[in-house]
Swiss-Prot record:
Chief location bin: mitochondrion
Record organism: Dictyostelium citrinum (Slime mold)
Subcellular location: Mitochondrion
Protein name: Large ribosomal subunit protein uL2m
Record-level GO BP terms: mitochondrial translation
Membership in a protein family: Belongs to the universal ribosomal protein uL2 family.
Coiled-coil spans in chain: none
Domain of life per record: Eukaryota
UniProtKB keywords: Mitochondrion, Ribonucleoprotein, Ribosomal protein
Signal peptide: none
């Protein structure tokens, strides 16, 4: 994909103050800091504002704040500009639309309600609740699969994490896969690439002192792996058991991955 960048629209970005993994001065996430300065681009996740209006893709740009590319769109004959997350195979000069038509034309980049999308279609930028803005499948190269219409209210969707979840038929989603699919294949060739992104070297817990890490000052074994804050790590679920949205999860991502492994092994 060729990126056509000619400067950022002044009303669509602002300065961004970096936190560098700190919370009130205390380290919340290790090995963060020292990244290049960035300008935050405002992304339009609520496309229902422009219902039944054709959007013209002016250019596709690189965004340092996210893994996916973004597309600068304008409403024809109105002079309104905004950014949206670009979809794979979306080209400069193409037209996209947000519509509720049940028998509308389904093309890459079109946004509509889940109930209007047939089974077996890949979607992205999915809403979790009605009119809440896109929340799921927004990273580079990700997409979700519509398995079937569960009932009149919900559809069964398989997310990129292999989790099978019920999502309301009234929620909006975009057809296609998020752009920059090559992100998973690309590897950093030198340390400076990671430092420019704000990723610093990570020191092993075993190499630290006991005051710095639970693994420090001792040999391996004798306890379960822990994080630097003392919480259990590796294969431990950190999700709240009493979370309200858990009732919409039909098959969790851990269970689904085990089922896929058994199918491969036969």
């Amino acid at each position: 994909m060729v990126l056509n960048w000619r400067g950022v629209k002044s009303r669509l970005y602002s300065g961004k103050r970096r936190i560098d993994g700190r919370n009130k001065g205390l380290i919340a996430i290790r090995a963060r800091g020292g990244a290049l300065k960035r300008k935050y681009r405002y992304i339009e996740h609520y496309k229902q504002k422009w219902m039944d209006k054709w959007l013209f893709v002016m250019r596709i740009e690189y965004d340092p704040n996210r893994s996916a590319h973004i597309a600068l769109c304008s409403i024809l004959k109105e002079g309104i500009y905004f950014y949206v997350i670009s979809v794979a195979k979306l080209e400069v000069g193409s037209l996209i639309i947000t519509s509720n038509l049940k028998q509308g034309i389904l093309q890459v980049g079109y946004t509509t309600k889940i109930k209007n999308i047939p089974e077996g279609i890949l979607i992205n930028n999915i809403e979790l609740m009605e009119n809440s803005g896109s929340k799921l499948s927004r990273a580079a190269g990700t997409s979700s699969l519509i398995i079937k219409q569960y009932n009149k209210k919900y559809s069964l969707v398989k997310l990129s994490s292999k989790e099978c979840r019920l999502i309301s038929n009234e929620c909006y989603a975009t057809i296609g896969t998020v752009s920059n699919i090559e992100k998973k294949i690309k590897k950093s060739k030198k340390a400076s690439e990671s430092r420019k992104k704000g990723i610093r070297p990570i020191v092993r817990g075993l190499a630290m002192n006991p005051v710095d890490h639970p693994h420090g000052g001792r040999t391996k074994g004798g306890m379960h792996w822990k994080s630097f804050s003392g919480k259990l790590a590796y294969n431990i679920s950190s999700r709240k058991k009493t979370k309200m949205s858990s009732r919409y999860i039909i098959i969790g991502h851990r269970k689904q991955r085990l089922m896929d492994k058994k199918k491969k092994n036969g």
